[in-house]
Amino acid sequence: MAAKDVKFGNDARVKMLRGVNVLADAVKVTLGPKGRNVVLDKSFGAPVITKDGVSVAREIELEDKFENMGAQMVKEVASKANDAAGDGTTTATVLAQSIVNEGLKAVAAGMNPMDLKRGIDKAVIAAVEELKKLSVPCSDSKAIAQVGTISANADETVGTLIAEAMAKVGKEGVITVEEGSGLQDELDVVEGMQFDRGYLSPYFVNKPETGAVELESPFILLADKKISNIREMLPVLEAVAKAGKPLLIIAEDVEGEALATLVVNTMRGIVKIAAVKAPGFGDRRKAMLRDIAILTAGTVISEEIGLELEKATLEDMGQAKRVVITKDTTTIIDGEGDKALIDSRVTQINQQRDEATSDYDREKLQERVAKLAGGVAVIKVGAATEVEMKEKKARVEDALHATRAAVEEGVVAGGGVALIRVANRIAELRGDNEDQNVGIKVARRAMEAPLRQIVANAGEEPSVIANKVKAGEGNTGYNAATEEYGNMIDMGILDPTKVTRSALQYAASIAGLMITTECMVTDLPKEDKPDLGGAGGMGGMGGMM
């Protein structure tokens, strides 16, 4: 085992604090409407320019191992805030830096670190309750656009695009961000249920100009099995031909003579047919087939529940207004399913999502909800260069997370004002002893830090403006973009309650642990062993050949 380097007490805390400040100082220059960019060098490709706090934090590794420990702990604050709310990483870092700096000053002055931490925790619990009281619901498109605009660093087009996307696919809908091909940002909405499976044979194509299959008011046969024998299909095909409607077959697979017969029927014009593989694999495929069945008012033909393909009737078929199939995707538009049954299915999947343990499962369940609830929106980010594209895409993703958080828990006044108001509201809070009271003061002082940093980044004097804002009431604050005072909500400067809450809780949690640190242990750097030097020739052997 490698030898260790151990530091105690003040020596350890000074080193740790230096690391905290290096990382936090790099991150906090990005805060607010007049925050600056940070350029990150990459081992390959062009440097990345970003205003995203967590992206900056993730890049920082310090040479001194004790300083690096401090930096890594603050990095954890930014990452946790990002995971919980998708935004607020810079605010969380600024809060953590303030708590650690003020807290360690108090420890150096002889306060008990454990009581300090208890005081900080008490203040944060009280502050979160007050934040919830200040929170107002965020339901209309205007408020959603404002939240998106603020989070995307005052880019109004991004806020408007996100609000449009949410209006079209619902607040539960899936909205994804992709790199576009032009200079303009675009919104592409896929209505209905779309899944990643295309037609099984190009002979099904009936729109050669687009290379797609379009079926108007088709019957939809859902089978949880491979279909290779055409005899199983004959009763269904005859019934559909009599009804004079097209047929879409969604099965585990359609192969061999069954597929050949379907192609021949289509080419001869006897009946319009298209076949696609069912989406997903294993249990997820079964669940998605059931989703499609509920959406289209059909039944999944499965031997597990005693249903056989030969005995299937038109009553077992699902129906939709229109189906469009390309070589890669199938889209079912306006299924005939009962609204109440669809809502019940959405509730059931949401419950599964809340209980899911892995991010992958949660994401897949959320996609299923969106497909049932109304569709998928894709925001295509436009930019002139790849460097700008990456920076802008990161901002749009942040803005999207922020708007989701706003819809979930509501909004509070932005620009650091909500935390100032909360700090005033808990002014009378007291701990069990004087050291805890100092901890409460440390937390309250930290709640001013985001506003002070926003003002400093705008080139103004933080103390003057912070005192003016503190003297105000309600949502009155300072708009750093226009350099004027006013009602932050009316000016459209909003922060999602969830983002502010998460930033405060994670900052206090990790900063509190750092204040109570008494010892730090790390590996000693390995010393390079000296080279053995060139091995000399063996003496006395020169005459040998």
Curated annotation (Swiss-Prot):
Its EC number is 5.6.1.7. Belongs to the chaperonin (HSP60) family. It is found in: Cytoplasm. This is Chaperonin GroEL. One of its GO terms (biological process) is protein refolding. InterPro entries: Chaperonin_Cpn60_CS, Cpn60/GroEL, Cpn60/GroEL/TCP-1, GroEL-like_apical_dom_sf, GROEL-like_equatorial_sf, TCP-1-like_intermed_sf. It is an enzyme of class 5 (isomerase). GO terms for molecular function: ATP binding; ATP-dependent protein folding chaperone; isomerase activity; unfolded protein binding. One of its GO terms (cellular component) is cytoplasm. Residues 526-545 are annotated as: Disordered. It comes from Sodalis glossinidius. Together with its co-chaperonin GroES, plays an essential role in assisting protein folding. The GroEL-GroES system forms a nano-cage that allows encapsulation of the non-native substrate proteins and provides a physical environment optimized to promote and accelerate protein folding. Keywords: ATP-binding, Chaperone, Cytoplasm, Isomerase, Nucleotide-binding. It catalyses: ATP + H2O + a folded polypeptide = ADP + phosphate + an unfolded polypeptide. HAMAP family: CH60. Disulfide bonds: none annotated. Forms a cylinder of 14 subunits composed of two heptameric rings stacked back-to-back. Interacts with the co-chaperonin GroES. Its main location: cytoplasm. Residues 533-545 have a biased composition (Gly residues). Coiled coil: none annotated. The keyword Acetylation does not apply. It comes from the Bacteria. ATP binds at residues 30-33, 51, 87-91, 415, 479-481, 495.
